[in-house]
Regions:
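Intrinsically disordered, low-complexity boundary segments flanking structured domains
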Residues: 1, 32-34, 111, 155, ...
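Hydrophobic faces of well-ordered beta-strands that scaffold small-molecule active sites
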Residues: 9-15, 43-47, 81-85, 123, ...
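Aromatic-lined substrate-binding rim segments of carbohydrate-active enzymes
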Residues: 30-88, 100-104, 161, 165
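Extracytoplasmic/secreted cell-surface and envelope-processing proteins
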Residues: 54-57, 90-96, 133-137, 176-179
Length: 223
């Protein structure tokens, strides 16, 4: 509890908030996990905001109050968010619904003032929105199959995230969608939940010795 503490680096929790249905308890998981791991001096929270039941709807003032309550608690605890917005909580076609590209763009535009307001509590924003858990695969609408859609969503995300903050993508090919736009490309960094020590069917060809792995190794020190 009294160890080294830096809200921009360190251990992290993982929390998820259903923005519509958890409006009365948006900080519940954050509070529980913070208490559970208090001895570890956790300084970051992987923060998922699920807009699952808001597809096709404008985000309301109540929705923003729900998300703000979460960020207010982060500030109280001295933590920062590794932030991701998503809609679909299952994969392989099992999600009940998913947004169109246009619906994603509309929500992103609404989120711009919220992100600006809370930028000091955000370490980085992950390029969620598309597919299962915002991982850019398995979307109901098949959005991951369109290079144009992915590039458009990514470019829009970069336009609404404050310039002081980077955006993380899971795979180098997503970053490479904007290779011809250096001012945007340089703000893209990487995250991957499945980098492993040996080749695996789920590693998306991200193991040592592949071009993707080499790109991450080469570019990550500068991001």
């Amino acid at each position: 509890e009294n160890g080294l503490y830096n809200p921009g680096r360190g251990f992290r929790l993982e929390t998820a908030v259903d923005v519509l249905h958890e409006k009365d308890t948006p900080t519940k998981e954050l509070l529980e996990l913070s208490e559970k791991y208090v001895a570890d001096s956790v300084s970051l929270a992987q923060s998922y905001f699920y807009l699952t039941y808001l597809i096709g709807e404008k985000l309301s003032e109540e929705n923003f109050q729900t998300m703000q309550a979460y960020f207010d608690e982060l500030q109280k605890q001295g933590k920062k968010a590794v932030l991701r917005f998503a809609y679909e909580r299952d994969f392989m076609g099992r999600a009940a619904a998913g947004p169109t590209g246009e619906q994603i763009l509309e929500h992103l535009e609404q989120l711009k003032p919220f992100l600006e307001k809370n930028k000091d509590l955000i370490l980085v924003v992950q390029a969620g929105m598309i597919g299962a858990w915002g991982e850019w695969h398995s979307s109901i609408q098949g959005l991951e199959n369109s290079e144009e859609t992915k590039a458009t969503v990514l470019e829009k995300l970069l336009s609404v995230v404050p310039e002081e903050r980077n955006v993380q993508v899971r795979l180098p090919e997503f970053k490479n969608l904007l290779k011809d736009k250096p001012e945007l490309y340089k703000r893209l960094s990487f995250h991957d939940d499945f980098i492993v020590i040996r080749p695996d069917r789920w590693d998306a060809d991200m193991h040592e010795g592949t071009a993707k792995f080499d790109q991450i190794v080469a570019e990550s020190p500068y991001l």
